[in-house]
Amino acid sequence: MADHDIPYLEERKLTKRWQGPWPILANMAFTLSIFAVTWWIFQDPRGIMRFYTPYVGYNYCRWWLIILIWMAYIFDFWPFKRNWIRNAHPLQKGLVLSLVSVGLMMLMIHGFFENVLGNFAFTYFSPRQLQKLPGLTEFYSTEYAAQACMMFAVIASWISPAWIVALEGRPWQNEAQPVKGFSIWLGTFCLSLVIYFMTMHNHMGILYYPWQYFTAITPPYWESFAQTVSANFHVAWIMCCTVVVWFMEGIWERYPFCLIKRPGLRRFALFFGIIAISLALCFFFWYMQELVWGDAIRGHRRDAAPDWRWLHVGETAIFFLVPALFLQFYGGNWPNKFSTPVNVLIRTVLVAIGGIAVYCLYYKYAHFALGTQKGFSHPQQFPMIPMIWLIDIWLINWWFMDGWPGWKRELRTSEEIVAEEHAFADRSAWSPAMIPGLAVGILAGVMLYFAIVAALPWFSAHFTLVQ
């Protein structure tokens, strides 16, 4: 393999610029300052542009996320020259690539979805077309169009990285850019569009009265199971898929699926394993809400409403993605000195603790710091917006800026990468000696599940997070 065929994110090695905690502190000060300034300018309801409506702001931050994934993971920074990517100063590179990503985001939202699809295919993508319908105000037209566009990005932000992480870019892995990038992009875009039609399109068909029986399945097919006609049911499990993809890529190191040595079987198992884990996580988060707040009540307007409960499943999942990416990027995916299963277990525990802490801090103080509404289920309360906004900034810092200022970049040769891949394969070999540990792990997992189920009602009765 020639060095120029290695994806840039794989050929680089980021090392701390200073000893001790100073690199982490420097990057946190840098990224959180950018978050605070940009949040005030673009999102904060008390700020300047006030995109937090909430769907307009959510649409932008969600599409920014998928554009970053496309640029770094799928196109490998094409059309920028590899020499410029390697040699440009991190600040210059971060600024240029960020501006390009914002331009692409605006092109996709306002160019393709709003003006092309909205004017020639689906009315609900265009605020201008929606305002021509009787009874729709400018505000709701804008919100509905933003919601429709955002829902596609939700699906794409799961499918696009999953194609790389689980399917390893097959069948175009050996193509050069831009053929490889456009092939994967078109493949994942079309698959995302099919999933959109089967999940989100029916939701858009019920937002205007009378329901659009001829063009959508109304009421949607999931109504009896999910106890709601809202596509928040799909937002729940798809958001969990998005989170689990990055768990698998980062803190889990694709374990235990990396133990499967047959490539085709491994890719198939990993892709659908991500979905299976996500569904389990989705229904567990739903059950947690029932343990804390009681049964969902169809027709309720706030925290007992099934549609909000499903939305909150996705919101809960995203709280755990923040510490997972922090640990992967700035924590060096600590620990690394034990066996892979032990490393994965410790990281998962740390991410669980971190996710709970972020969840509690957000609902306790976000209305002061971010200008959001106090409480859990207010229509203006969308925690996924600030969480994904922060994640976007971290991705820019780590992918575009090579971890500057706390980290510096070194380049690895193809021989070093192959040697590391062989070492990873050796660590990922199945052994019968793992069977006792596997049995203990399953037993411990079952015990932990019942312990959480028993503890949640007690914590709910004795602690109040939001007064």
Model-assigned labels for residue ranges:
Residues 110, 114, 118-137, 152-220, ...:
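Internal, hydrophobic cores of structured domains that mediate oligomerization or house catalytic pockets
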Residues 2-75, 103, 107-108, 154:
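N-terminal signal-anchor module of multipass membrane proteins
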Residues 28, 32, 36-43, 232-253, ...:
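C-terminal transmembrane-bundle signature of multipass membrane proteins
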Residues 18-31, 88-108, 177-194, 263-280, ...:
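Transmembrane alpha-helical segments of multi-pass membrane proteins
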Residues 28, 86-96, 118-130:
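N-terminal, membrane-interfacial amphipathic/helix-forming hydrophobic leader that caps
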Residues 36-50, 108-130, 194-218, 280-298, ...:
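Membrane-helix interface motif
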Residues 24-28, 53-70, 95, 109-110, ...:
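Alpha-helical transmembrane segments of polytopic membrane proteins
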Residues 2-18, 71-94, 156-183, 205-209, ...:
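Cytoplasmic membrane-interface regions of multi-pass membrane proteins
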